[in-house]
């Protein structure tokens, strides 16, 4: 991912497993490069924070890592991004569940999983298309790097 971005890119995370993975795996190289709510559990933080970052620094790439649970907390802000012509990229990790909640249930509640999986899969590509966002679906792609690079470097 980092190889596809400018070194000045601002990385924003929502709350969930994707937040942990981003914090652990992304090669951050300077202060202020990561915007996250930390351990405060504020699902829905990512998309509005990415909008703010992109408005404050329109010359920098802004990428929001989110999960299917977190993005649904403020999904309407996709409309704001399109209406205000804000250049953000959303990397959505969709596992059809509240992944971090599910993981905690598996680890600490003897595999008793309750209300952390969604009954019906959500089609986020169609939703984003409906808001007028450009979309790329990496599901099932054996080598996602070329598509990811194109998506991240596309202007809006």
Residue ranges and their predicted role:
Residues 1, 14-16, 37-39, 67-69, ...:
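Fold-independent oxyanion-binding glycine-rich loops
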Residues 1-53:
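Active-site diphosphate/adenylate-binding microenvironment
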Residues 1-15, 135, 139-145, 149-150, ...:
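Phosphate/pyrophosphate-binding active-site segments
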Residues 9-11, 32-35, 60-63, 87-91, ...:
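Structural motif
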Residues 29-30, 84, 131:
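Short, structured coil segments at secondary-structure junctions
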Residues 56-147:
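Conserved thiamine diphosphate
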